[in-house]
Protein backbone atom coordinates (compact mmCIF):
# COMPACT_ATOMS: atom_id res chain seq x y z
CA UNK A 1 0.00 0.00 0.00
CA UNK A 2 1.41 3.38 -0.99
CA UNK A 3 2.27 5.83 1.72
CA UNK A 4 0.55 9.18 1.59
CA UNK A 5 3.65 11.25 0.91
CA UNK A 6 4.10 14.98 1.31
CA UNK A 7 4.93 17.05 -1.74
CA UNK A 8 8.56 18.10 -1.90
CA UNK A 9 9.68 21.65 -1.23
CA UNK A 10 11.22 21.68 -4.73
CA UNK A 11 8.97 24.10 -6.65
CA UNK A 12 8.66 25.19 -10.25
CA UNK A 13 9.49 28.83 -11.04
CA UNK A 14 6.55 31.24 -11.47
CA UNK A 15 4.43 30.23 -14.46
CA UNK A 16 1.10 31.24 -15.96
CA UNK A 17 -1.80 29.41 -14.30
CA UNK A 18 -3.39 26.47 -16.10
CA UNK A 19 -6.43 28.64 -16.78
CA UNK A 20 -4.17 31.32 -18.30
CA UNK A 21 -2.42 28.74 -20.48
CA UNK A 22 -5.78 27.47 -21.72
CA UNK A 23 -6.73 31.04 -22.69
CA UNK A 24 -3.29 31.82 -24.13
CA UNK A 25 -3.28 28.76 -26.38
CA UNK A 26 -7.03 28.99 -27.02
CA UNK A 27 -7.57 25.44 -25.85
CA UNK A 28 -10.97 23.85 -25.64
CA UNK A 29 -11.78 20.39 -24.33
CA UNK A 30 -12.58 18.03 -27.19
CA UNK A 31 -15.93 16.40 -26.50
CA UNK A 32 -15.16 13.49 -28.83
CA UNK A 33 -12.07 12.70 -26.72
CA UNK A 34 -13.97 12.97 -23.39
CA UNK A 35 -11.57 15.68 -22.21
CA UNK A 36 -12.15 17.47 -18.90
CA UNK A 37 -9.52 19.78 -17.40
CA UNK A 38 -8.72 19.80 -13.68
CA UNK A 39 -7.54 23.32 -12.87
CA UNK A 40 -7.48 23.35 -9.05
CA UNK A 41 -3.87 22.69 -8.02
CA UNK A 42 -5.01 21.74 -4.52
CA UNK A 43 -6.81 18.77 -6.06
CA UNK A 44 -3.97 17.85 -8.41
CA UNK A 45 -1.58 18.04 -5.43
CA UNK A 46 -3.90 15.70 -3.51
CA UNK A 47 -3.89 13.15 -6.35
CA UNK A 48 -0.10 13.21 -6.36
CA UNK A 49 0.13 12.87 -2.56
CA UNK A 50 -2.12 9.81 -2.69
CA UNK A 51 0.24 8.21 -5.20
CA UNK A 52 2.83 7.97 -2.41
CA UNK A 53 6.35 9.31 -1.99
CA UNK A 54 7.51 10.40 -5.46
CA UNK A 55 10.85 11.90 -4.45
CA UNK A 56 13.39 10.74 -7.07
CA UNK A 57 10.70 8.54 -8.66
CA UNK A 58 10.16 7.89 -12.36
CA UNK A 59 6.60 8.75 -13.30
CA UNK A 60 4.58 7.98 -16.41
CA UNK A 61 1.64 10.38 -16.75
CA UNK A 62 -1.10 9.50 -19.21
CA UNK A 63 -3.20 12.21 -20.81
CA UNK A 64 -1.58 15.28 -19.21
CA UNK A 65 -3.70 17.74 -21.20
CA UNK A 66 -2.88 21.34 -20.21
CA UNK A 67 -0.58 20.11 -17.44
CA UNK A 68 -2.38 20.49 -14.11
CA UNK A 69 -1.33 17.15 -12.61
CA UNK A 70 1.98 17.49 -14.47
CA UNK A 71 2.86 20.53 -12.36
CA UNK A 72 2.01 18.75 -9.14
CA UNK A 73 4.17 15.77 -10.12
CA UNK A 74 7.13 18.01 -10.96
CA UNK A 75 6.70 19.80 -7.63
CA UNK A 76 7.04 16.41 -5.91
CA UNK A 77 10.74 16.39 -6.90
CA UNK A 78 10.62 13.37 -9.21
CA UNK A 79 13.72 12.14 -10.99
CA UNK A 80 11.93 12.09 -14.34
CA UNK A 81 8.39 12.58 -15.62
CA UNK A 82 7.35 11.07 -18.94
CA UNK A 83 4.08 12.36 -20.39
CA UNK A 84 2.28 10.86 -23.38
CA UNK A 85 -0.27 13.15 -25.01
CA UNK A 86 -2.31 12.34 -28.11
CA UNK A 87 -3.65 15.87 -28.70
CA UNK A 88 -1.02 18.11 -30.32
CA UNK A 89 -2.77 21.26 -29.05
CA UNK A 90 -1.39 20.59 -25.57
CA UNK A 91 2.25 20.15 -26.57
CA UNK A 92 3.23 23.89 -26.44
CA UNK A 93 1.89 24.23 -22.89
CA UNK A 94 3.71 21.08 -21.80
CA UNK A 95 6.88 22.36 -23.47
CA UNK A 96 6.58 25.47 -21.30
CA UNK A 97 6.68 23.20 -18.24
CA UNK A 98 9.63 21.29 -19.66
CA UNK A 99 11.57 24.54 -20.10
CA UNK A 100 10.81 25.44 -16.47
CA UNK A 101 12.10 22.07 -15.22
CA UNK A 102 15.17 21.27 -17.35
CA UNK A 103 15.95 17.57 -17.63
CA UNK A 104 12.87 16.53 -15.65
CA UNK A 105 10.03 16.38 -18.19
CA UNK A 106 10.02 14.22 -21.31
CA UNK A 107 7.13 14.78 -23.74
CA UNK A 108 5.91 12.17 -26.21
CA UNK A 109 3.19 12.81 -28.76
CA UNK A 110 1.44 9.45 -28.92
CA UNK A 111 -1.45 7.21 -27.91
CA UNK A 112 -1.38 5.66 -24.42
CA UNK A 113 -3.17 2.57 -25.78
CA UNK A 114 -0.21 1.75 -28.05
CA UNK A 115 2.78 3.45 -26.37
CA UNK A 116 5.53 1.01 -25.30
CA UNK A 117 6.30 2.25 -21.80
CA UNK A 118 8.35 -0.89 -21.09
CA UNK A 119 11.13 0.72 -23.15
CA UNK A 120 10.79 4.19 -21.64
CA UNK A 121 12.86 3.91 -18.46
CA UNK A 122 16.23 2.45 -17.50
CA UNK A 123 16.65 -1.31 -17.03
CA UNK A 124 18.25 -0.50 -13.66
CA UNK A 125 14.81 0.39 -12.27
CA UNK A 126 13.53 -3.17 -12.60
CA UNK A 127 12.80 -5.13 -9.43
CA UNK A 128 11.86 -8.77 -8.87
CA UNK A 129 8.09 -9.21 -8.68
CA UNK A 130 8.32 -10.47 -5.09
CA UNK A 131 10.10 -7.29 -3.94
CA UNK A 132 8.51 -4.00 -2.93
CA UNK A 133 7.06 -1.99 -5.85
CA UNK A 134 9.68 -0.27 -8.03
CA UNK A 135 10.29 3.47 -7.99
CA UNK A 136 8.10 3.76 -11.09
CA UNK A 137 4.55 5.12 -10.96
CA UNK A 138 1.67 5.63 -13.38
CA UNK A 139 -0.55 8.65 -12.75
CA UNK A 140 -3.31 10.05 -14.91
CA UNK A 141 -6.56 11.93 -15.27
CA UNK A 142 -7.93 9.54 -17.87
CA UNK A 143 -10.41 10.60 -20.56
CA UNK A 144 -13.62 8.69 -19.86
CA UNK A 145 -13.60 7.20 -23.37
CA UNK A 146 -10.35 5.28 -22.83
CA UNK A 147 -10.36 4.61 -19.09
CA UNK A 148 -12.00 1.16 -19.15
CA UNK A 149 -10.14 -0.30 -22.17
CA UNK A 150 -6.88 1.10 -20.79
CA UNK A 151 -7.26 -0.40 -17.30
CA UNK A 152 -8.23 -3.77 -18.83
CA UNK A 153 -5.11 -3.58 -21.01
CA UNK A 154 -2.94 -2.80 -17.99
CA UNK A 155 -4.54 -5.57 -15.92
CA UNK A 156 -3.61 -8.02 -18.66
CA UNK A 157 -0.09 -6.55 -18.59
CA UNK A 158 0.01 -7.23 -14.83
CA UNK A 159 -1.07 -10.83 -15.43
CA UNK A 160 1.72 -11.27 -17.99
CA UNK A 161 4.19 -9.02 -16.11
CA UNK A 162 4.88 -7.04 -19.25
CA UNK A 163 4.19 -3.49 -20.48
CA UNK A 164 4.57 -1.02 -17.58
CA UNK A 165 5.05 -3.98 -15.24
CA UNK A 166 8.37 -5.17 -16.63
CA UNK A 167 9.80 -2.94 -13.88
CA UNK A 168 7.96 -4.90 -11.19
CA UNK A 169 4.71 -4.20 -9.35
CA UNK A 170 4.32 -0.66 -10.71
CA UNK A 171 1.68 1.29 -8.78
CA UNK A 172 -1.06 3.27 -10.53
CA UNK A 173 -3.12 6.25 -9.40
CA UNK A 174 -5.85 7.00 -11.93
CA UNK A 175 -9.14 8.84 -12.32
CA UNK A 176 -12.39 7.28 -13.54
CA UNK A 177 -16.05 8.19 -13.63
CA UNK A 178 -17.24 7.78 -10.05
CA UNK A 179 -19.44 4.84 -11.03
CA UNK A 180 -16.48 3.03 -12.61
CA UNK A 181 -14.29 3.80 -9.59
CA UNK A 182 -16.93 2.32 -7.30
CA UNK A 183 -17.16 -0.79 -9.46
CA UNK A 184 -13.41 -1.30 -9.43
CA UNK A 185 -13.31 -1.29 -5.62
CA UNK A 186 -16.73 -2.91 -4.95
CA UNK A 187 -16.91 -5.69 -2.37
CA UNK A 188 -18.64 -9.03 -2.90
CA UNK A 189 -22.40 -8.61 -2.57
CA UNK A 190 -22.54 -4.87 -3.22
CA UNK A 191 -24.74 -3.43 -5.95
CA UNK A 192 -21.66 -2.01 -7.68
CA UNK A 193 -20.00 -5.43 -7.95
CA UNK A 194 -19.19 -6.08 -11.62
CA UNK A 195 -16.83 -7.64 -14.11
CA UNK A 196 -14.35 -4.82 -13.43
CA UNK A 197 -14.41 -5.54 -9.69
CA UNK A 198 -13.30 -9.14 -10.18
CA UNK A 199 -10.78 -8.47 -12.95
CA UNK A 200 -9.06 -5.72 -10.94
CA UNK A 201 -9.19 -7.34 -7.50
CA UNK A 202 -7.85 -10.76 -8.45
CA UNK A 203 -4.67 -9.02 -9.61
CA UNK A 204 -4.40 -5.88 -7.45
CA UNK A 205 -5.05 -4.25 -4.13
CA UNK A 206 -7.62 -1.67 -5.27
CA UNK A 207 -8.58 1.43 -3.26
CA UNK A 208 -11.08 4.12 -4.21
CA UNK A 209 -9.26 6.82 -2.28
CA UNK A 210 -11.38 9.93 -2.83
CA UNK A 211 -13.98 11.54 -5.07
CA UNK A 212 -13.65 14.82 -6.98
CA UNK A 213 -16.92 16.68 -7.66
CA UNK A 214 -17.64 17.18 -11.34
CA UNK A 215 -17.83 20.95 -10.80
CA UNK A 216 -14.05 20.97 -10.23
CA UNK A 217 -13.49 20.20 -13.92
CA UNK A 218 -13.72 22.36 -17.02
CA UNK A 219 -15.99 21.69 -18.80
CA UNK A 220 -18.05 20.20 -15.97
CA UNK A 221 -18.84 16.53 -16.69
CA UNK A 222 -22.26 15.13 -15.87
CA UNK A 223 -20.71 12.82 -13.26
CA UNK A 224 -18.28 13.05 -10.36
CA UNK A 225 -14.81 11.53 -10.66
CA UNK A 226 -13.19 8.88 -8.48
CA UNK A 227 -9.45 8.54 -7.85
CA UNK A 228 -8.35 4.91 -7.61
CA UNK A 229 -5.01 3.47 -6.48
CA UNK A 230 -3.80 0.07 -7.69
CA UNK A 231 -0.94 -2.01 -6.27
CA UNK A 232 -0.34 -5.31 -8.12
CA UNK A 233 -0.41 -8.37 -5.86
CA UNK A 234 2.67 -10.56 -5.52
CA UNK A 235 0.49 -13.61 -6.13
CA UNK A 236 -2.70 -13.28 -8.21
CA UNK A 237 -5.79 -14.65 -6.49
CA UNK A 238 -6.65 -16.65 -9.62
CA UNK A 239 -3.69 -18.40 -11.22
CA UNK A 240 -5.05 -18.90 -14.71
CA UNK A 241 -4.42 -17.07 -18.02
CA UNK A 242 -5.96 -13.61 -18.15
CA UNK A 243 -8.11 -14.38 -21.21
CA UNK A 244 -9.59 -17.44 -19.52
CA UNK A 245 -10.47 -15.50 -16.36
CA UNK A 246 -11.89 -12.68 -18.46
CA UNK A 247 -14.08 -15.09 -20.44
CA UNK A 248 -15.54 -16.73 -17.33
CA UNK A 249 -16.16 -13.40 -15.58
CA UNK A 250 -17.70 -11.78 -18.66
CA UNK A 251 -20.09 -14.68 -19.16
CA UNK A 252 -21.22 -14.61 -15.55
CA UNK A 253 -21.87 -10.86 -15.46
CA UNK A 254 -23.62 -10.59 -18.82
CA UNK A 255 -26.72 -11.78 -16.96
CA UNK A 256 -26.01 -9.88 -13.75
CA UNK A 257 -29.63 -9.98 -12.53
CA UNK A 258 -30.00 -13.73 -13.13
CA UNK A 259 -28.64 -16.68 -11.18
CA UNK A 260 -24.98 -17.33 -11.96
CA UNK A 261 -25.71 -20.59 -13.79
CA UNK A 262 -27.44 -18.57 -16.55
CA UNK A 263 -24.24 -16.88 -17.67
CA UNK A 264 -22.06 -19.94 -17.09
CA UNK A 265 -24.21 -21.92 -19.52
CA UNK A 266 -22.95 -19.68 -22.32
CA UNK A 267 -19.44 -21.09 -21.90
CA UNK A 268 -20.58 -24.30 -23.59
CA UNK A 269 -22.04 -25.30 -26.99
CA UNK A 270 -25.79 -25.83 -26.96
CA UNK A 271 -25.57 -29.59 -27.45
CA UNK A 272 -23.69 -30.07 -24.17
CA UNK A 273 -24.75 -26.90 -22.34
CA UNK A 274 -26.87 -28.25 -19.48
CA UNK A 275 -24.65 -31.25 -18.73
CA UNK A 276 -21.38 -29.27 -18.85
CA UNK A 277 -22.75 -26.38 -16.78
CA UNK A 278 -23.94 -28.81 -14.12
CA UNK A 279 -20.53 -30.48 -14.05
CA UNK A 280 -18.73 -27.12 -13.80
CA UNK A 281 -20.86 -25.99 -10.86
CA UNK A 282 -20.60 -29.33 -9.09
CA UNK A 283 -16.81 -29.62 -9.38
CA UNK A 284 -16.34 -25.96 -8.39
CA UNK A 285 -18.77 -26.43 -5.47
CA UNK A 286 -20.80 -23.33 -6.42
CA UNK A 287 -24.46 -22.79 -5.55
CA UNK A 288 -26.13 -22.25 -8.96
CA UNK A 289 -28.67 -19.85 -7.42
CA UNK A 290 -26.08 -17.29 -6.34
CA UNK A 291 -26.31 -13.98 -8.19
CA UNK A 292 -23.16 -12.78 -10.01
CA UNK A 293 -22.52 -10.03 -7.43
CA UNK A 294 -22.60 -12.65 -4.65
CA UNK A 295 -19.67 -14.57 -6.11
CA UNK A 296 -16.37 -13.93 -4.32
CA UNK A 297 -12.91 -14.06 -5.86
CA UNK A 298 -12.59 -17.54 -4.31
CA UNK A 299 -15.74 -18.61 -6.15
CA UNK A 300 -14.31 -17.33 -9.42
CA UNK A 301 -11.00 -19.08 -8.71
CA UNK A 302 -12.83 -22.40 -8.36
CA UNK A 303 -14.84 -21.78 -11.53
CA UNK A 304 -11.75 -20.81 -13.54
CA UNK A 305 -9.72 -23.78 -12.27
CA UNK A 306 -12.46 -26.26 -13.22
CA UNK A 307 -13.15 -24.56 -16.56
CA UNK A 308 -9.42 -24.75 -17.35
CA UNK A 309 -9.48 -28.53 -16.75
CA UNK A 310 -12.53 -28.85 -19.01
CA UNK A 311 -10.72 -26.86 -21.71
CA UNK A 312 -7.69 -29.14 -21.37
CA UNK A 313 -9.99 -32.13 -21.91
CA UNK A 314 -11.64 -30.47 -24.93
CA UNK A 315 -9.11 -28.15 -26.66
CA UNK A 316 -11.84 -26.59 -28.83
CA UNK A 317 -13.91 -25.48 -25.83
CA UNK A 318 -11.98 -22.31 -25.00
CA UNK A 319 -12.44 -20.99 -28.55
CA UNK A 320 -16.21 -21.49 -28.34
CA UNK A 321 -18.23 -18.27 -28.54
CA UNK A 322 -21.97 -18.57 -28.06
CA UNK A 323 -22.60 -15.40 -30.07
CA UNK A 324 -20.94 -16.99 -33.10
CA UNK A 325 -23.20 -20.01 -32.66
CA UNK A 326 -26.23 -17.70 -32.61
CA UNK A 327 -25.03 -15.97 -35.79
CA UNK A 328 -24.60 -19.30 -37.59
CA UNK A 329 -28.03 -20.45 -36.49
CA UNK A 330 -29.60 -17.17 -37.62
CA UNK A 331 -27.84 -17.42 -40.98
CA UNK A 332 -29.10 -20.98 -41.49
CA UNK A 333 -32.65 -19.93 -40.62
CA UNK A 334 -32.48 -17.06 -43.11
CA UNK A 335 -31.19 -19.40 -45.83
CA UNK A 336 -34.02 -21.85 -45.08
CA UNK A 337 -36.59 -19.05 -45.28
CA UNK A 338 -35.18 -17.98 -48.65
CA UNK A 339 -35.31 -21.58 -49.93
CA UNK A 340 -38.90 -21.95 -48.71
CA UNK A 341 -39.88 -18.72 -50.43
CA UNK A 342 -38.21 -19.82 -53.67
CA UNK A 343 -39.98 -23.20 -53.55
CA UNK A 344 -43.29 -21.43 -52.93
CA UNK A 345 -42.78 -19.26 -56.04
CA UNK A 346 -41.99 -22.38 -58.10
UniProtKB/Swiss-Prot annotation:
SMART domains named in the record: rADc (SM00650)
Keywords: DNA-binding, Methyltransferase, Mitochondrion, RNA-binding, rRNA processing, S-adenosyl-L-methionine, Transcription, Transcription regulation, Transferase, Transit peptide
Keyword Nucleus attached: no
Tissue expression profile of the protein: Ubiquitously expressed.
EC number: 2.1.1.-
Localisation: Mitochondrion
Outcome reported for the amino acid change (mutating residue 85 to A): Inhibits rRNA (adenine-N6,N6-)-dimethyltransferase activity
MF terms in GO: DNA binding; mitochondrial transcription factor activity; RNA binding; rRNA (adenine-N6,N6-)-dimethyltransferase activity; S-adenosyl-L-methionine binding
Transit peptide as recorded in UniProt: 1-27
Induction: By the nuclear respiratory factors NRF1 and NRF2/GABPB2 and PGC-1 coactivators.
Subunit structure comment from the entry: Interacts with mitochondrial RNA polymerase POLRMT. Interacts with TFAM. Bound to the maturing mtSSU until the late stages of assembly.
Function noted in UniProt: Mitochondrial methyltransferase which uses S-adenosyl methionine to dimethylate two highly conserved adjacent adenosine residues (A1583 and A1584) within the loop of helix 45 at the 3-prime end of 12S rRNA, thereby regulating the assembly or stability of the small subunit of the mitochondrial ribosome. Also required for basal transcription of mitochondrial DNA, probably via its interaction with POLRMT and TFAM. Stimulates transcription independently of the methyltransferase activity.
HAMAP family tied to this protein: 16SrRNA_methyltr_A
Similarity section: Belongs to the class I-like SAM-binding methyltransferase superfamily. rRNA adenine N(6)-methyltransferase family. KsgA subfamily.
NCBIfam families recorded: ksgA (TIGR00755)
Protein known as: Dimethyladenosine transferase 1, mitochondrial
Amino acid sequence: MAASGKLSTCRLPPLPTIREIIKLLRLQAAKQLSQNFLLDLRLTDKIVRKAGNLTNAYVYEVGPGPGGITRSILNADVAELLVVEKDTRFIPGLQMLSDAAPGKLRIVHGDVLTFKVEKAFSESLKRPWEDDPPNVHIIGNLPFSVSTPLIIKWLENISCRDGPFVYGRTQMTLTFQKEVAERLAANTGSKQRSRLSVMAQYLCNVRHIFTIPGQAFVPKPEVDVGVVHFTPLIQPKIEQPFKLVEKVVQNVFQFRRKYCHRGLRMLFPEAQRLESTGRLLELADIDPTLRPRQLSISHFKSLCDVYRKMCDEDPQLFAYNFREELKRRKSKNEEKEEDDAENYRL
